[in-house]
């Protein structure tokens, strides 16, 4: 009687506190199931079989679960359902399962919580830790990711040290576990994310995940598609690529027509248009649609660049940038345009290039309606409306709205001219200037000035030149009233008032008000004279000197004095001559007060005070104040040699 009473009480407790199959089942929707690869589906099937069999082995009278009954009505899961049901009811464990249904006798005991109990009692002795679930739901905002039903519960286990199930026997050992089948894990070490990356410090739950992550540092992509040659870091990505029919991208964005082969990429892209930003940077407040973008962005603030190129040592903040960079060394250009055959090292460059053929300009300015083929060009254009110029020159303080303009400007300080003409050796700051120069050499110059005969291949250069003759003034100096036909000329002139000389020679430290003056000066150090007279072979440092020299051969004197009719080859000669009529002497010596009409005469006079004699004869060492005296002296040595 006593034994029957205990058995009845045990059965009653079992009904009240038992763990049913649905408590340990993992449920998937049709959409979620479609995203699983073969390995994941097999794992799912094995886990579900093990869960059901373990519950059955505890002696609990189970019928076909409601979950499995549902599966039988869903056609996409037919194969797995059939295998699962057959594995439970008709497979190798059927005999043991039926035996457990027929008997309530105690079977082999098992060590749980340091105490030996029977399988008959297991179902009673362990229950759901309801206090864990209550605290779990109170803190469901822990990471901002939304889940539904049991998916949320499973996800929240990652945030908790505790697991779902605890020992019901007064919780003597305080030990917990997450699933009924894993009873052996009670004594297992529960330390999480024990595998850490030595490169960036990121931690992972298992060694295989760490191994996959390390490939992002090394750039290793062991899984390559034989059809298109595309390689992948991860086997799952490779499998997904292989399943996707060639060139098929069924997920198309209606906003910008960009297409995707994967629904998850499409959803992440859509967040860009709708402005949905789940992840926000605490440093600057910038929002991102996915966590990986935020992680990469944070490295801008920290300066962290964990991905380093082994070829040149250059480091990058994200693995994709390193992968693109490596193609510079390898010369690999896997993305080819089907229209013109041009190849690119990155898919984004190909997408932008294709828009040249299609004429597509998806990025439109909301201010003026102007459209662009690249988002970066729209960003730069937007600054013309806001006036923002974030890229500032450290040498002279001039600011620009895009980095390329700053890079070009910096060449004026350094004197760098990377674009050189193969015909004459002349170098330029800009590729466009070189292109114009090359065209000028190979084509006619139809735009000829009627005043001085100078010809131009470009109409804009011709119009600017004509203003010099016509006196058509557009830009006036507010300091002295002097006027100019070009804004750049006014800018340079203003520096004569401010004393600013932003362009400094690195050889001797001498500074200049314009970059062109610095360029000419640098040639005095290098000895370069790129402009040569075809008549006599004499070479000059700058083109204007060659043009003036050519007039000695042609006899041309385009600059005529209106007072006396005397003509000159150079405009500066006419300016000095005109002062003879006006009596103007603007160059005054601070030492003695003597004034001069010509700057060269003034400089010669100043040397009489300082004793400077810059023109020295290499034959005898004698020095002179002015170049005319020096040239006269050199001729005396040539006569002696004759």
From Swiss-Prot:
C2H2-type zinc finger span: 195-217, 223-245, 251-273, 279-301, 307-329, 335-357, 363-385, 391-413, 419-441, 447-469, 475-497, 503-525, 531-553, 559-581, 587-609, 615-637
GO terms of molecular function: DNA-binding transcription factor activity, RNA polymerase II-specific; RNA polymerase II cis-regulatory region sequence-specific DNA binding; zinc ion binding
Swiss-Prot/TrEMBL GO biological process terms: regulation of transcription by RNA polymerase II
InterPro entries: KRAB, KRAB_dom_sf, Znf_C2H2_sf, Znf_C2H2_type
Domain KRAB: 19-90
Localisation: Nucleus
SUPFAM superfamilies: beta-beta-alpha zinc fingers, KRAB domain (Kruppel-associated box)
Superkingdom of the source species: Eukaryota
Gene Ontology CC terms, in alphabetical order: nucleus
PANTHER family according to UniProt: ZINC FINGER PROTEIN, ZINC FINGER PROTEIN 850
Family under the similarity heading: Belongs to the krueppel C2H2-type zinc-finger protein family.
UniProt function note: May be involved in transcriptional regulation.
Involvement in disorder: DEGCAGS syndrome: An autosomal recessive neurodevelopmental disorder characterized by global developmental delay, coarse facial features, and abnormalities of the cardiovascular, gastrointestinal, genitourinary and skeletal system. Other common features included anemia or pancytopenia, immunodeficiency and recurrent infections, and sensorineural hearing impairment. Death in childhood may occur.
Protein name stated in the entry: Zinc finger protein 699
Organism: Homo sapiens (Human)
Name of the gene encoding the protein in the UniProt record: ZNF699
